[in-house]
Amino acid sequence: YWWFLVSLLGALLVFLLFVQGGNSLLFTLGRTHEERTMLVNSTGRKWEFTFTTLVTFGGAFFASFPLFYSTSFGGAYWLWMIILFTFVLQAVSYEFQSKLGNILGKRTYQWFLVINGVVGPLLLGGAVATFFTGSNFLVNKGNMGNELMPVISSWANGWHGLDALTNPWNLVLGFAVLFLARILGNLYFINNIRDKELIPHCRCQLITDTIPFLILFLAFVIHTLLLSLIHI
């Protein structure tokens, strides 16, 4: 039951990453102020869904696998904190870029959206990749009966999750998720925006993002399958 729920929320989260994919394309597709405004207005009506699903996804992990949740979210907190910070940055950018008295300027907040669109999916993919490549944590269930030291899981180093980015295969899946988000963002813009000049750019960018996604994703899948065969 819990595996089904977590898988469902994970799939829904990936689907909703079209918002982040659209954010990463803001200056790639939006070559004029008017085009960037159309892109921001298009994704600005949907960003809450991704944020809510991300939080629900974490809650489902807590309910289903509390030891994993406490170890990953507590031990690797720098990685997860950066992910959450980029999503908070997204919320602030959508809300304040057009407000009166905006001292940072609209373009600054648009670059914040780009940061969210690139860093968010990249680190999410890297974090998920650790489920397959492993993480540097220790589990000592003998501490369950120790009142002076009740901690049963702890991170093995002081990097607290940032060490996951030193594994190239974590980055491979991270970039695969990033390009997948950009694919979904392009498809969303094609179906949501009616502009004769912008849509052709979206179609060309769709092909540009599909090729590296297929290469990276297939490479990660093949690598993971080969590792599983070696350990049989």
Regions inferred by a protein language model and the residue ranges of each:
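Loop-centered beta-sheet repeat module
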Residues: 153-213
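Alpha-helical transmembrane segments and their helix-start/interface "positive-inside/aromatic belt" motifs
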Residues: 1-7, 106-124, 201-211
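Membrane-interfacial helix termini and the short, flexible loops that connect transmembrane helices
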Residues: 22-36, 65-70, 91-112, 189-202
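N-terminal signal-anchor module of multipass membrane proteins
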Residues: 1-49, 55-57
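Conserved small/polar residues in nucleotide/adenosyl-binding loops
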Residues: 230-232
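Hydrophobic core of alpha-helical transmembrane segments in multi-pass integral membrane proteins
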Residues: 210-222
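Central hydrophobic cores of alpha-helical transmembrane segments in multi-pass inner-membrane proteins
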Residues: 12-25, 60-62, 85-96
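Membrane-interface helix-loop-helix junctions at boundaries between adjacent transmembrane segments
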Residues: 71-80, 89-177
